[in-house]
Amino acid sequence: MAESAGASSFFPLVVLLLAGSGGSGPRGVQALLCACTSCLQANYTCETDGACMVSIFNLDGMEHHVRTCIPKVELVPAGKPFYCLSSEDLRNTHCCYTDYCNRIDLRVPSGHLKEPEHPSMWGPVELVGIIAGPVFLLFLIIIIVFLVINYHQRVYHNRQRLDMEDPSCEMCLSKDKTLQDLVYDLSTSGSGSGLPLFVQRTVARTIVLQEIIGKGRFGEVWRGRWRGGDVAVKIFSSREERSWFREAEIYQTVMLRHENILGFIAADNKDNGTWTQLWLVSDYHEHGSLFDYLNRYTVTIEGMIKLALSAASGLAHLHMEIVGTQGKPGIAHRDLKSKNILVKKNGMCAIADLGLAVRHDAVTDTIDIAPNQRVGTKRYMAPEVLDETINMKHFDSFKCADIYALGLVYWEIARRCNSGGVHEEYQLPYYDLVPSDPSIEEMRKVVCDQKLRPNIPNWWQSYEALRVMGKMMRECWYANGAARLTALRIKKTLSQLSVQEDVKI
């Protein structure tokens, strides 16, 4: 009887203490969301990497219904965690593992529905048992948790030691290896999927930040230095962890590396004790984005063709599917615009910002995409995205939307082409038809209802290169996505134009 009474007072106390703490584990990329009766400031919701729990019990004659999170580290022993156990006479507890699965009502344990027929007084021996039992069990739980944490730490340190002893890693980061050597190794590696994770961590944690060069909705972009070379460091805020993970994942797709796609170097999460910084390290291009470049400079016909052809080459490589054991899935960008294309020293483009990209698995014919039709920048959205008629289950639909946006980028480039001393000032597409920050409704009215497109000047017809560019733009802007050019067709047309204009690529 003493043991039963001790458990009766201990388990409700543990459940109440756990509910008071919110029970949330470390936030992860796929955190589990649970109902939480004590999380007033978090809208009665908590996040965990473990399980959701709901429990009902009587304490001092009062009925308590508790919902909370159980961190993964506290789900011990495996398969039958203490926190998830019920007792026929003491409490009713249920653990589950899907979002908000603990929003259920449990029945009060049957033992609490009956009044004891023969109440008895507790003697000294019973009191000792009541006090000692819960204390012993609490110490047992603490010891188990400590052993589990210690085990995971030993496994982690062993992995680090193995990484450091890996001769391939030692070779990758020998002291005389420069940034140029590292980039060359990336370009010539067989997998084309990036550096080993250990090397990425080491590179990221030895970069010295120099100056901030840009800001966006995700965070900041810095110029950094590593072994005498410049790198670009995109620093995500902690609330953008999903975006950081997604972009790093896309950049490390097998066979993605291409001269016209921004070169990925490393990804790392840096914890300074106060907050976590999420880093994405890539090649640095001093000209910045195509948007910045066109605002500062005009371009020659040769420069226009190089920019347009390299952008088409990068997009064609993204869209292309390579079948085989070392194959590459088709990738659609979904946020193509002049601010997401960088200009290299040689006047060529490199497509960047793949955080919203989707990949297509040709074997299963599936697309890894969140169920959200409206993404990207409103000004560059294709008609089918604006009016929500895009077929989200068909990968070609996303490629067609990219082509529409590429046509708008070409319009921005061609306006800045200096032909015979004539050029126009830089403007964004639809600058004369919508406000500086247009809404979906404003863009839909112009693009879908009125079927308007950016103006192509008549004087472009006087120059073969501008005439070809204008014709391609119109074929990129068709309302019917299936009628638009493909990236590969655009690349071939511009390659022929470069030969005609004697452009050295």
From Swiss-Prot:
It comes from the Eukaryota. It catalyses: L-threonyl-[receptor-protein] + ATP = O-phospho-L-threonyl-[receptor-protein] + ADP + H(+); L-seryl-[receptor-protein] + ATP = O-phospho-L-seryl-[receptor-protein] + ADP + H(+). This is Activin receptor type-1B. Forms an activin receptor complex with activin receptor type-2 (ACVR2A or ACVR2B). Part of a complex consisting of MAGI2/ARIP1, ACVR2A, ACVR1B and SMAD3. Interacts with SMAD2 and SMAD3. Interacts with SMAD7. Interacts with FKBP1A. Interacts with IGSF1. Interacts with CRIPTO. Interacts with TDP2. Interacts with TSC22D1/TSC-22. CDD domains: STKc_TGFbR1_ACVR1b_ACVR1c (cd14143), TFP_LU_ECD_ALK4 (cd23536). The gene is ACVR1B. Changing L40A: Increases binding to activin. Residues 177-206 form the GS domain. Activin receptor type-2 (ACVR2A or ACVR2B) activates the type-1 receptor through phosphorylation of its regulatory GS domain. Its cofactor is Mg(2+); Mn(2+). Belongs to the protein kinase superfamily. TKL Ser/Thr protein kinase family. TGFB receptor subfamily. It comes from Homo sapiens (Human). Its main location: membrane. Residues 150-505 are cytoplasmic. Keywords: ATP-binding, Cell membrane, Glycoprotein, Kinase, Magnesium, Manganese, Membrane, Metal-binding, Nucleotide-binding, Phosphoprotein, Receptor, Serine/threonine-protein kinase, Signal, Transferase, Transmembrane, Transmembrane helix, Ubl conjugation. Expressed in many tissues, most strongly in kidney, pancreas, brain, lung, and liver. Its EC number is 2.7.11.30. It is found in: Cell membrane. Residues 1-23 form the signal peptide. The active site is at D335 (proton acceptor). Residues 24-126 are extracellular.
